[in-house]
């Protein structure tokens, strides 16, 4: 299957550069996955599309302010560090710019010395293993010194860090927000609960590979990055109850979808408490084992994310919906509008 089959024309002006003032002010397109029928709505109306006994599954990961700007201790030369993955204790795999300035043994300082670091290993493609030194709690130091690692297509500065976090974010560890969750407010979650819709949480720490374009010509040749996920015993039991009672399981975002499909795929369609790393790649031809529907944003052309959405609703239906979104000037990508596939 050719990657070009998932291409579409997108005017640059439709790429949302800043979040809306109100989280739930975004628009909502509802796509019937069976017929391809479309309904233009608003996210404030999301509750009306759910029934008592349904279950919504959200990703409670919290984004690390993982961009650090510092200097080399010996020369004062400026460097930028992007935290990718915690290896052990205070050692992290990072991406350094410019990489040539940081060799094994190089010492870096951040925030007037509140945080220092030493390079312990040089990796490929600008990667470096870095060991940090600091007083206090690392994540608190990071919250005060770090900046959000916004996607490359967002050029504007983010005034409020919390607008790149969901209102239910809890488990620190993501390099990017699970953006479908950004539309939810506490009020909408309460309304859903009052209607008898279950709200459950999983954790998947989003890696920067989520922004990596599919470089292969053929879909099947693309290798997905691995991301850490976790599901508790309580959540697994709740989802199995919903399934048994005939309720619909609707995932919020591609991250929740990949977590649920990984777990159900490994346990004959059942949900069970588990944690690990997933590199599941979902594209047309995949048979879903966990979800009945999905809330997601509008994705990049030829991305693994639009392929996942196409696996659920059909490529023709999705591309038709995207053409409609362009005509109606929906906002695209991380800070853009939402789609409900049901």
UniProtKB/Swiss-Prot annotation:
Instruction: Enumerate the GO terms in the molecular function aspect.
Output: S-adenosylmethionine:tRNA ribosyltransferase-isomerase activity
Q: Where in the cell is it found?
A: Cytoplasm
Its GO CC terms are: cytoplasm
Q: Name one GO biological process term.
A: tRNA wobble guanine modification
Q: Report the domain of life of the source organism.
A: Bacteria
- Which reaction(s) does the protein catalyse, per the Swiss-Prot or TrEMBL entry? 7-aminomethyl-7-carbaguanosine(34) in tRNA + S-adenosyl-L-methionine = epoxyqueuosine(34) in tRNA + adenine + L-methionine + 2 H(+)
Keyword annotations of the record: Cytoplasm, Queuosine biosynthesis, S-adenosyl-L-methionine, Transferase
Disulfide bond in keyword set: no
Q: In which pathway does it act?
A: tRNA modification; tRNA-queuosine biosynthesis
E.C. numbers: 2.4.99.17
What InterPro entries does the record tag this protein with? QueA, QueA_dom1, QueA_dom2, QueA_sf
Q: What does this protein do?
A: Transfers and isomerizes the ribose moiety from AdoMet to the 7-aminomethyl group of 7-deazaguanine (preQ1-tRNA) to give epoxyqueuosine (oQ-tRNA).
The record's listing under PANTHER family reads: S-ADENOSYLMETHIONINE:TRNA RIBOSYLTRANSFERASE-ISOMERASE (PTHR30307:SF0)
Q: Kindly state the subunit structure of this protein.
A: Monomer.
Q: Which family does it belong to?
A: Belongs to the QueA family.
- Can you say what this protein is called? S-adenosylmethionine:tRNA ribosyltransferase-isomerase
Name its species: Bacillus velezensis (strain DSM 23117 / BGSC 10A6 / LMG 26770 / FZB42) (Bacillus amyloliquefaciens subsp. plantarum)
């Amino acid at each position: 299957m050719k990657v070009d089959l998932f291409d579409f024309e997108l005017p640059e002006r439709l790429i949302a550069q800043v979040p809306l003032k109100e989280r739930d002010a975004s628009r909502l397109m509802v796509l019937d996955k069976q017929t391809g029928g479309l309904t233009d709505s608003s996210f404030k109306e999301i509750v009306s599309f759910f029934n008592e006994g349904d279950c919504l599954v959200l990703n409670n990961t919290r984004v690390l302010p993982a961009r650090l700007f510092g200097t080399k201790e010996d020369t004062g030369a400026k460097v930028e560090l992007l935290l990718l993955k915690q290896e052990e204790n205070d050692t992290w795999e990072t991406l350094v710019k410019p990489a040539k300035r940081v060799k094994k043994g190089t010492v870096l300082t951040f925030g007037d010395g509140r945080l220092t670091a030493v390079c312990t290993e040089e990796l490929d493609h600008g990667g470096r293993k870095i060991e940090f030194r600091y007083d206090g709690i690392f994540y608190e130091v990071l919250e005060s010194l770090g900046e959000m690692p916004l996607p490359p297509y967002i050029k504007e500065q983010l005034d409020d860090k919390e607008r790149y976090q969901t209102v239910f974010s809890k488990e620190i560890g993501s390099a990017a927000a699970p953006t479908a969750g950004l539309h939810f407010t506490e009020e909408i979650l309460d309304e859903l609960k009052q209607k008898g819709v279950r709200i459950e949480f999983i954790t998947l720490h989003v890696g920067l590979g989520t922004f990596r374009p599919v470089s292969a010509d053929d879909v099947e040749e693309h290798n997905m990055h691995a991301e850490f996920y976790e599901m508790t015993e309580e959540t697994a039991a709740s989802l199995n109850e919903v399934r048994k009672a005939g309720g619909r399981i609707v995932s919020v975002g591609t991250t929740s979808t990949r977590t649920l499909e990984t777990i159900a795929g490994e346990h004959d369609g059942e949900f069970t408490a588990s944690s690990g790393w997933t590199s599941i790649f979902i594209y047309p031809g995949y048979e879903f084992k966990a979800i009945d529907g999905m809330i997601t944003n509008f994705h990049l052309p030829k991305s693994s994310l639009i392929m996942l959405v196409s696996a659920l609703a059909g490529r023709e239906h999705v591309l038709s919906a995207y053409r409609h979104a362009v005509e109606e000037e929906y906002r695209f990508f991380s800070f853009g509008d939402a789609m409900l596939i049901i």
